[in-house]
Amino acid sequence: AGTIHDLSRFVAHQYRIPFVSVPTAASSDGFASTVADMTWDGMKKAVKAESPLYVFADTDIFGKAPKRLTAAGVSDILGKYIALADWKISSLLTDEYYCAEVVNLETRALRMVKDNLKEIAAGEEDACEKLMYALVLSGLAMQMTGNSRPASGAEHHLVHLWDMEVLNGHLDALHGEKVSAGTMVALIEYKKIADAIRRKTCKVHTHIEEDREFLQSAFGKKGVLNAIEKENAPELLDEISTRQLSDALPEIMPIISALPAVTDMQ
């Protein structure tokens, strides 16, 4: 499923050889993607990977996969709520490229899964096929942008942090299971921000010094802090002033309000 696909797509890209995808479980959205998330020298990185010439997904196989794997695929898709909100807010603040066509494709995948949750859980063949189709669509969305922006936001960043094991030990959880946790953490925080905006108590301030101390304590002991700083240079937050962010709060509010309620996602 996901891990084997990522490794295969990465090797295919490195050696410039064709790649055919045969997913045996509807567990992640990386089957048709052109990027792969790999742990490299202690760091989690999105690396170039080969997109498949063909995807052969047999319902008789992936539809009978362990339900835990299927649930992980559902969670990977539901995480797009956060990814798309992140992208829209970033575009609002920094004029980052934002493609409505890609967003519509990813939203279509989201709706396809959301509207068939009970049927997917029951293992109904048609619903399981829709889940697989949604996962492939999400991979195509990444192909269209050339990166993982439409499919990966704060919810995946949390997963990558956990995968690096700088704050925690090894987690015996599937990628999609960790995405579900990351989605809930991000959603709860977003709703807190929306509530503060609504009550006019939302204050924007910088945590640069506190962030530096945290990064040193968390990543310094792993010996990857310098590499992480180099990977993330220049500092993108330097493009956004606290005044600019404060002024944008009224426009950010409806983006957050469009996210599902925390109780619905639970």
What annotation goes with each model-predicted range?
Residues A1-V20, E119-L131:
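N-terminal small/polar loop signature for handling phosphorylated ligands or for N-terminal nucleophile
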Residues H13-M112:
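A glycine/threonine-rich phosphate-anchoring loop and its flanking beta-alpha core
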Residues L105-M265:
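Active-site segments that bind and position negatively charged phosphate/pyrophosphate groups
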Residues I4-D6, S27, T34, S180:
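Short, electropositive, low-hydrophobicity segments enriched in small/polar residues
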Residues S8, D29, K64, L161-W162:
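Generic hydrophobic alpha-helical membrane-span motif
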Residues R9-A12, S75-L78, S180, M184:
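Short, well-ordered alpha-helical packing segments
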Residues A1-G2, G30, G73-S75, G139, ...:
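Glycine-centered flexibility sites
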